[in-house]
A protein has these predicted regions:
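P-loop NTPase motor core of the ASCE superfamily
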Residues: 3, 78-81, 117, 128-200
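Conserved P-loop NTPase motor cores
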Residues: 1-26, 31-32, 36-144
């Protein structure tokens, strides 16, 4: 996503902060590889703190990526504040990478409701998740996400990581009929050929 940020995001970021789990601080080979690819990437271990990172002083657009700390995020007042306050007033975007979207937690529901885009990867071992999310987002089309993945599986078998972007942003430039899409990155020829799944 960072590699093709100009195709994915509508603004450039003055700073990008990548937050790794504190448990891997002793073995940071992965983070070192990231720094080699993205030299300007700021890497920290654990959850972010807006004041400690001095993100309030920079009025330009900033991005925080929190990787593999979803359970901690849904219990964190700091993450809650980033979603509900700082993202609106401090020009901060945040990406949470997790494995259990419906985890029961103190702030999980609020984080979900304040998430403007969800990227869902196909997991054939958990079809119930797709059904639950479809019913929550598209109550009149409870099979829309499963049908979209079935289309990708049938027509793009060579793509290992099949994903859907569900755009629920109120400021999205696309109409509601295009809120579910895939293939958002450029292909080998440099052209982006998105696929849309209108919930009709």
């Amino acid at each position: 996503m960072l590699k093709y940020s100009k195709f994915v995001f509508d603004k450039d970021f003055s700073r990008i902060v990548y937050c790794c789990p504190s448990e891997i601080s002793h073995n940071n080979h992965y983070c070192s590889e990231l720094k080699n690819i993205f030299p300007n990437l700021e890497i920290i271990y654990g959850l972010p703190n807006v004041d400690a990172l001095q993100l309030r002083t920079d009025k330009n657009h900033k991005l925080i990526i929190v990787d593999d700390q979803f359970d901690s995020c849904t219990q964190s007042k700091e993450i809650y504040d980033i979603f509900t306050i700082h993202s609106h007033h401090e020009n901060i975007s945040i990406i949470l990478i997790g494995h259990n979207f419906f985890t029961r937690s103190k702030y999980g529901t609020t984080l979900s409701r304040n998430t403007t885009a969800k990227i869902i990867f196909y997991d054939k071992a958990d079809q119930l998740f797709l059904s639950l999310l479809s019913r929550r987002l598209f109550p009149s089309h409870p099979k829309i996400l499963s049908e979209a993945f079935s289309f990708l599986i049938e027509n793009f078998p060579e793509n290992y990581a099949k994903y859907l972007v569900v755009d629920t942003s109120p400021s999205s430039y696309l109409p509601q009929s295009f809120m579910i899409r895939s293939n958002i990155f450029p292909e080998k020829d440099g052209v982006v050929r998105p696929i849309f799944f209108p919930p009709n």
